[in-house]
Amino acid sequence: YDEMETNTPQKKEQQIEKKSSSKYINYETVDKDSPKINIYNHKTGKTQQMDIEEYLYGVLSGEMPSDFNIEALKAQAVAARTYTIHKQENETSKHKGSAVCTDYTHCQEYKSYEELKESKGEEWIKSSYPKIKQAVNDTKGQIITYNGEPIVPLYFSTSSGKTENSEEVFSTEYPYLRSVDSPYDKYAPKYASTLKISNKDLESKLKSTYSDINITQNNLSSQIKILNRSDGGSV
């Protein structure tokens, strides 16, 4: 695999170095195409073996809209491949004898060719699927590493303009998953949303969770305040 090494020096700038490595999977010694991995299909309850790059076609199709810029799709392909290799190389993260599963709440979103054809239609298959395949093929074998090991690329759709430190969202602190400004998120389709809830409904929800809470819909504004924020600005 080609590794794109991330370093976290004392200064804020992060450096990325691309280098060649066959530590994890060497295409030349596996077969002429690419290595096979075991995937647990949570819909069928069965494990299937699949070419890793073919698997990534289905992941990329499910994780990112095909009308996004090709470079964004390539970046997503590298992140998804890195995630897959990390799961493959860490025994504790495997389940049901497989490296990954098709359940996006546990691993990554995955749509088979048949599912894509049924849900998106023939026109999408003809016009957009080739772009998905190009993004995967153009980055074939590329993963991101830190200190010589595949990183845990906990990617997500959209931030509020600044990402979070990993421990603010998950239980583990990773030196390469630090809060940074992400100003381009404002162009994302899901950047901002508004949810309106009545004082009565909020009171009901709070009391259903905290039965001993002393609060009423009449004094919400005086009893609710922001106590602290994360480095990323989240409440």
Model-identified regions with their sequence ranges:
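Conserved, single-site charged/polar hotspot
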Residues: Y1-V235
